[in-house]
């Protein structure tokens, strides 16, 4: 067993600033759990294009409100505190924060902890892993 304190992650290579967002990676690939767990903050008034081509993600909103638009069909999903949205089909999406948002994100497969989004809004797949849904 181990205990990870958020305060111990802030300011390390697991505390990643992506411009519109900042994410502290609490559990990562090297922890051997098969998923990663992130505490992510999104800035109010921003729109972020995301497309996790190699990862599935569940997002539990613990503060704030916004909306997620799935690019494929243009459907808009309002999300707010104490709601969870699940990107179970590698959905390309736009995240719009109406207010500052804080969320707990779970990724499968796990990230290493230092990733930032590429030009498509994706995290790279670790070389030794096979993509989900392939």
UniProtKB/Swiss-Prot annotation:
It comes from the Bacteria. GO terms for molecular function: ectoine synthase activity. Pathway: Amine and polyamine biosynthesis; ectoine biosynthesis; L-ectoine from L-aspartate 4-semialdehyde: step 3/3. Its EC number is 4.2.1.108. It catalyses: (2S)-4-acetamido-2-aminobutanoate = L-ectoine + H2O. Coiled coil: none annotated. One of its GO terms (biological process) is ectoine biosynthetic process. Keywords: Lyase. Catalyzes the circularization of gamma-N-acetyl-alpha,gamma-diaminobutyric acid (ADABA) to ectoine (1,4,5,6-tetrahydro-2-methyl-4-pyrimidine carboxylic acid), which is an excellent osmoprotectant. NCBIfam families: PRK13290.1 (NF009806). Belongs to the ectoine synthase family. This is L-ectoine synthase. It comes from Shouchella clausii (strain KSM-K16) (Alkalihalobacillus clausii). The lineage of its organism: Bacteria, Bacillati, Bacillota, Bacilli, Bacillales.
């Amino acid at each position: 067993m181990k205990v990870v304190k958020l305060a111990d992650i802030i300011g390390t290579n697991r505390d990643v600033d992506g411009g519109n967002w900042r994410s502290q990676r609490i559990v990562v690939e090297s922890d051997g759990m098969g998923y990663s767990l992130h505490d992510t903050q999104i800035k109010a008034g921003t729109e972020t294009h995301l497309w996790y081509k190699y990862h599935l993600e569940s997002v539990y909103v613990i503060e704030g409100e916004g909306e997620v638009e799935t690019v494929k069909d243009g459907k808009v999903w309002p999300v707010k505190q104490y709601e969870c949205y699940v990107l179970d089909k590698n959905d390309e999406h736009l995240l719009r924060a109406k207010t500052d948002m804080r969320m707990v994100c779970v990724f499968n497969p796990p990230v290493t902890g230092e990733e930032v989004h590429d030009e498509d809004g994706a995290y790279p797949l670790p070389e030794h892993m096979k993509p989900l849904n392939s």
